[in-house]
Amino acid sequence: MTLRPPQPVVPNCRVRPSVGALPWIMLCLLAGANLARGAEEEVSFVRDIAPLLTRHCTGCHGPTKVEGDYRLHTFVALQKTGASDSPTLTPGQPEQSELYLRLIDDNESTRMPQWDDPLSAGQIALVERWIRQGAQFDGRDPNVSFKSQMPPRTHPAPPAVYKVAVPVQACAISPDGREVALGGHHEVTVWNLQTGTLLRRLANLPKRIQSIVYEPTGSRLLVAGGTPGDYGEIVALDAADGGNRQVVQTAEDLVLSIALSHDGQHLASGGADRVVRSFIRDGQERWSFAWDSRLFSDWITEVAYGAGDEFVLVACRDYTAKVLTPAGALYTTYNGHQRQFGSENGRFEIYALATEAGGPRVFTAGLGRSIRMWEAAKAQVENGSAADMEERFAQAGHTKYFPHDAQRGVFKLATAGNLLFAATGEGRLRQYELPEGKLLREYPDQQDWLFGLAVHPATERAVTTTRGGVARVWNTTTGELIHEWLAAPGLTLDPAARLAKP
């Protein structure tokens, strides 16, 4: 119901009000104005204003590009003055707020967005109303990007039938070894691991699926992905039908990796926004934010928990792997992918990370010629301090190297007991014996980039997925190919692309 200000009764004859009546008339008018304002819908910064600023303003006034000495990607930055020194926001007074005045400026050289279509009248009115209502911030943290605090997006349904296959960058085998979940276009497809038949489709998810994790019971899935350069998201949902959903996190760029602690109570994430985030289970199925770490200068490509959950391990495209404590503090940095001397010298981006089941060893790989095997505690000792720098440089270090010789690098690592698996950009899956690093088997050439890898020790099965959307199931004891299919509903694998010829 819309409240309207009380209307004065106007007599048929024109009567000049007495001086004594004027205060009562003014009181009625003010009361009517207050009623109208009270009925006006409250404008939300996070819901209504942040999407406008993100879409039209942060391209020139964001964290990297700064026009007019002004950023507005966080609420704290938004409130600061730019080169004009005029107040950006004067709560309650749009006409004294540079943010509003620049939107209605008639001069195209000073109007914002500059040299672009102006905001619509409705959008400008929304900004004006928000400032007039007090310019309140209703997000979680005014110091971090408000794009990462905007409401989750509504995702479209996936295509009923795929016209072309999409790269499958994420795969996960259910704890009981019966199913494998694969990333699709706005969906996760779930297949029978024994027969390769499609079981169900979990739809209305982010455009690109980058990481999938089953919770220990197998009843819930955690799915991460987004849209490159624009949006990231983590969703928790029922594995059976995609119901009971919780958007655990939104981010301003792709979420590339998620990992679940061994006790199933903690979740870590990392991605293209260069932030590691941690979440804690709240009750049975809900997750709440715990902490974040912003120590990274490039994309975070993989996260994992160490044995016993004593560390959160982070692989980064900045040539380092960092080790964090369960509370998010930096424990040490592993620099074995950027060496000046020795046979493994060079600077190499890290794409893959895995940990030893029940042991302290960590495995990292990416570009370069070898997989590195190292331990967090020993890496901390070797880092030492400036006082013992010369002595440390003279030492060989504890890292062991397993050659892979993949010119395109290694994109995924996985461990199973005393076995290490590496999926390469050349299309080959390599299997090593631990701890010596002896190459036990090189699986048949799949002639495509391998993007996804999952291993299930109990059933002796490994799943690989390719850039072309092909999923293959392997026997890890014999190296035999069990099944292969195109993970795109409605399409079938071209016979010429099959490794198992009829």
Q: What positions do the PLM features span?
A:
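N-terminal secretory signal peptides that target proteins for export/translocation
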Residues: M1-V19
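Serine/threonine-rich, low-complexity intrinsically disordered segments
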Residues: R4, L27, T466-G468
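WD40-repeat beta-propeller superdomains and closely related acidic/aromatic-rich repeat-like regions
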Residues: D138-P502
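Bacterial N-terminal signal peptides
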Residues: G20-A33
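Secreted/luminal cysteine- and crosslink-motif detector
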Residues: P5, R14, L29, T58-H61
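Aromatic- and Gly/Pro-enriched helix-to-coil junctions and flexible linker segments
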Residues: A36-P175, G184-H185
